[in-house]
């Protein structure tokens, strides 16, 4: 009627206890974080996930990088959005020479 205690059964029991404690700790921390975020930002909506990759995180169609043009405040030229950083580095370094 008494269960025999072996090294394997004790080790398994300790392992299960530690594993359960770790899982419960992670779940409780995440629950607290989620509740705090919900209190701080009650109207926040989750981001939209599009598996095809054609929509951005707000659920709108992605815009091609080359379609966005930004006017440089230094020289006044229209520069493509994906080249703006490189243009700005060159544009600002021209005055130092």
UniProtKB/Swiss-Prot annotation:
Q: Which Pfam family, any one, appears in the UniProt record?
A: Sgf11
What InterPro entries would the database entry show? SAGA_su_Sgf11 (IPR013246), Sgf11_N (IPR041216)
**Entry keyword Iron-sulfur:** no
Cite the residue ranges of zinc fingers (SGF11-type): 70-91
- List the Gene Ontology MF annotations in alphabetical order: transcription coactivator activity; zinc ion binding
The entry's localization annotation reads: Nucleus
UniProt GO BP = chromatin organization
> Which key words are in the record?
Activator, Chromatin regulator, Metal-binding, Nucleus, Transcription, Transcription regulation, Zinc, Zinc-finger
Q: Name one GO cellular component term.
A: DUBm complex
Report the sequence similarity comment from the record. Belongs to the SGF11 family.
Q: How does it assemble?
A: Component of the 1.8 MDa SAGA transcription coactivator-HAT complex. SAGA is built of 5 distinct domains with specialized functions. Within the SAGA complex, SUS1, SGF11, SGF73 and UBP8 form an additional subcomplex of SAGA called the DUB module (deubiquitination module). Interacts directly with SGF73, SUS1 and UBP8.
Q: What does this protein do?
A: Functions as a component of the transcription regulatory histone acetylation (HAT) complex SAGA. At the promoters, SAGA is required for recruitment of the basal transcription machinery. It influences RNA polymerase II transcriptional activity through different activities such as TBP interaction and promoter selectivity, interaction with transcription activators, and chromatin modification through histone acetylation and deubiquitination. SAGA acetylates nucleosomal histone H3 to some extent (to form H3K9ac, H3K14ac, H3K18ac and H3K23ac).
Its domain comment says: The long N-terminal helix forms part of the 'assembly lobe' of the SAGA deubiquitination module. The C-terminal SGF11-type zinc-finger domain together with the C-terminal catalytic domain of UBP8 forms the 'catalytic lobe' of the SAGA deubiquitination module.
Name by which UniProt lists this protein: SAGA-associated factor 11
Q: Which gene encodes it?
A: SGF11
């Amino acid at each position: 009627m008494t269960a025999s205690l072996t090294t394997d059964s004790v080790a398994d029991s300790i392992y299960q206890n530690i594993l359960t404690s770790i899982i419960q700790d992670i779940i409780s921390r995440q629950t607290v974080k989620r509740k705090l975020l919900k209190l701080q930002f009650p109207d926040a909506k989750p981001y939209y996930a599009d598996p095809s990759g054609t929509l951005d995180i707000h659920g709108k169609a992605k815009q091609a990088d080359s379609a966005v043009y930004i006017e440089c405040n230094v020289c006044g030229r229209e520069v493509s959005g994906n080249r703006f950083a490189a243009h700005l580095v060159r544009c600002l370094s021209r005055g130092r020479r």
